[in-house]
Amino acid sequence: MSKTVHVIGAGISGLAAAIRLARAGLTVHVHEAMQQAGGRCRSYFDAQTGLVIDNGNHLLLSGNHAACEYARTIGTEAGLVGPERAEFDFIDLPANARWRLKLGGGKLPLWLFDANSRVPDTSIGDYLGLMPLLWAPTTKLIGDTINCSGPLYDRLVAPLLLAALNVDPPEGSAGLAGAVVRETLLAGGKACRPLIARDGLSAVLVEPAVAQLAARGPGVQFGHELRALTPAGDRVGALQFGGEDVVTLGPDDAVVLAVPPRPAASLLPGLKTPQEYRAIVNAHFNYAPPPGMPALTGVIGGVVEWLFAFPNRLSVTISNGDRLVDAPREQLAAEIWGEICKIAGISANLPPWQIVRERRATFAATPAQNALRPGPVTQWRNLYLAGDWTDTGLPATIEGSVRSGNRAADLVLAAGRA
């Protein structure tokens, strides 16, 4: 069993690995280059709106078993809130049409047989047309696998896959899309109940993990950026953090490298990583939602794609947002607010707002970029990779992050037992 494990990076994948290892009884040191944990999944106080906001609006589903188990392990599962049933409200802005997708509460997609539960103007046959995704390889395009037109595609498949893959769906990997469909629509309503970190991502998924790690051992050291790895034969022998700050590894010690692909490639020359990334744009408005407004609304035909109603604010998410990263902020905020007023049925002047543009939010989930994702094992027998950009079998999601951290931790534990 490894005596000590050094986890490099305190994003979700790093925290998941660290929690799993610490609970297994190992001494775990977490080294984070920034002054805050969470990576791209974090909250902070924004002076412009006067609110604590998330850098991105992340949606979990009840079928995200790894993420939900992670929250349960750190004692915050109750902080993931959502409706009792798997129901999603949608609005088609150009058609001025609203509907509610009702996925039921079972393990089978029986909702497909109820016209009142399906997307309007769709038949069971339309959904059967998605079946080729289930056995498609990751090397195949979605656009070459299913029909990318019609009511079902426009009103459900496109928004679902756009949010999951963060690329225009026809150019996305059919295999990754198939994984999403298998774990959501095909898994029945029991797996599709939407869950939101109502009190913020940091409060629910990050800070409790940091506190638990501190209670169990050395915890997280912030502002501690790994500068180089020193090899010793077929293993990593030392970690260099700059100057004389060097950590020498014992013969049974291990390292989990849970950093973004750029620093990972810098630390491991020759490591192949995805090279193309796509932006996600989020906007937050200091305006309490009207009574009875759904916590989540999918939007068709607008700039807004998903509208989140938090107790004290309205927030939107726009995926594959490269086209908006250089748009004038004031103009973009006004355009988004105008759509929010239509969606929420309100009439109000533009409230205090903030635009958050994550330019490299996720790797582009295309066949070519997916092929560049590395597995967790490296050329060094005591060094393992974690991150949503590694080869998890899923797009870049919180669920993928947690699974990758768990996988790296399990490899460390297995090596210790060998």
Swiss-Prot record:
Pfam families the UniProt entry points to: Amino_oxidase (PF01593)
Catalytic function, reaction form: squalene + FAD + H2O + H(+) = hydroxysqualene + FADH2
MF terms in GO: oxidoreductase activity
Signal peptide boundaries: none
Top-tier EC class: oxidoreductase
Top-level taxon of the source organism: Bacteria
InterPro entries per the UniProt record, alphabetical: Amino_oxidase (IPR002937), FAD/NAD-bd_sf (IPR036188), SQase_HpnE (IPR017830), Zeta_carotene_desat/Oxidored (IPR050464)
Associated pathway: Secondary metabolite biosynthesis; hopanoid biosynthesis
EC number: 1.17.8.1
Sorted UniProt keywords: FAD, Flavoprotein, Oxidoreductase
Alphabetized Gene3D superfamilies for the sequence: FAD/NAD(P)-binding domain
Function: Involved in the biosynthesis of the hopanoid precursor squalene (SQ) from farnesyl diphosphate (FPP). Catalyzes the third (last) step, the reduction of hydroxysqualene (HSQ) to SQ.
Assigned protein family: Belongs to the HpnE family.
NCBIfam families: HpnE (TIGR03467)
Protein name from the UniProt record: Hydroxysqualene dehydroxylase
Record gene name: hpnE
